[in-house]
Amino acid sequence: MDLLRLREKGIFLSQRRRKWLIFMAISGVSGYGAYKVYHLPSVARKRKRLFKLFGAIVSVAELISDSAETLSMVSRDVKDFLNSDSDEIPNSLKQIAKITTSNEFTDSLSRVSQAVTIGAFRGYKSESSIGDSGIEKSSDSSVVDRVIDKVFSEAGTGFVSVVVGSFAKNLVLGFYSGKVESGVKCEGSDSSETPRWVTLLGDDKCRELLADCIERFTSTAIGVYLDKTMDINTYDQIFEGLTNPKHQDSVKDVLVSVCNGALETIVRTSHDVFTSSRSKNVIEEIEDDDFKSNGSARSKMVSESGDGVKSNGWTEAIATTLAVPSNRRFMFDVTGRVTLETTRSIIAFIMVKTFQGFRKSINVVHEEVTDRGRQAVEYVGAKSSVIITVCLALYLHIISGCVRNSPIGVSQHF
């Protein structure tokens, strides 16, 4: 009995040890496999990405918590400031303003906006250049050309006009409201403070920007104009329009109006200059003498001398002007040219009118002579036909009388 028990107990222990050995072997193999799989390159890359993802999630959580604390602090300061009557701005808002006005923040913001804009344009361009079938298609027009086409369409022009109008309106309202709030008058103010926009325009960078804009705009406009008018002669078109018979009356009216206005302006300006300058100088000198000498007789002389100056202002001014040799030469040249052109115009007009009169008289004489000759020919023809008719009738009457009274027959007479 004891042997049977010991045998059964040994068999049970051996089976139990065998299970443990099998379990340990399986555990070792699985652990080794897990170790190998864990240290594979692909698994290592995925593991690093997963760790980075977890790190990013943790950083975002920390950022959210920190920003929540910051927002709560800023909102609390703003709430306290709005509820209080103090004029001092909280320190949190001052620090935020310092951050927003710092060079690092503006540079970072400009770089981020630049990168976002470039990425958006590249993505839009790549998407537009690839068709639905995945084959790249050649785009004839660029993004800028398509944007300009959209802007210059009917809907685009309406949208742009609304946007520009609202922007200008809000800009003007904000400018004047800021002036009113700061206590600066818009016009006629006695304050010596220079407006902010004047200071901005007077800045070196703003002047460089304006100069670059004007240069670009001018060069572009001139280039486009030269390209468009390369094969066009502007002066030929102007003279063709002026010499067109359809525009003769309009051109005459325009030239007459321009010449009349120019002459009127020259005469009026020269008269005002010659009279006012000389009269003012003489009157000022005489008034100085009046103040020194004190008398009513002097004032009377002033009025008389003023009248004399006004009456003799033209002659004195012309004499003074002609005293200069260059002015005299110029005056003689202009006078000679005007006289020559006037004489030429008068002679041409007289010749044209004389030629027209000769033509009319010749035509009248020719018509009169032709009418009289035709009437004479008609009269002579009528009279000659009557005479011939009478002669023939008389001749036939005589012949018939002779034949009737003679005893010889008609055949014997002929």
From Swiss-Prot:
**Major localization class:** membrane
Q: What are the record's GO terms for cellular component?
A: membrane
Question: Where does the UniProt annotation locate this protein?
Answer: Membrane
Q: Give one GO term, molecular function aspect.
A: carbohydrate binding
The lineage's top-level taxon is Eukaryota
Instruction: Write the record's keywords in alphabetical order, separated by commas.
Output: Membrane, Transmembrane, Transmembrane helix
Q: Where are the transmembrane segments?
A: 20-40, 379-399
Q: Has the keyword Transmembrane been applied to this entry?
A: yes
The way it spans or sits in the membrane comes to: Multi-pass membrane protein
Name of the protein in question: Protein PHLOEM PROTEIN 2-LIKE A10
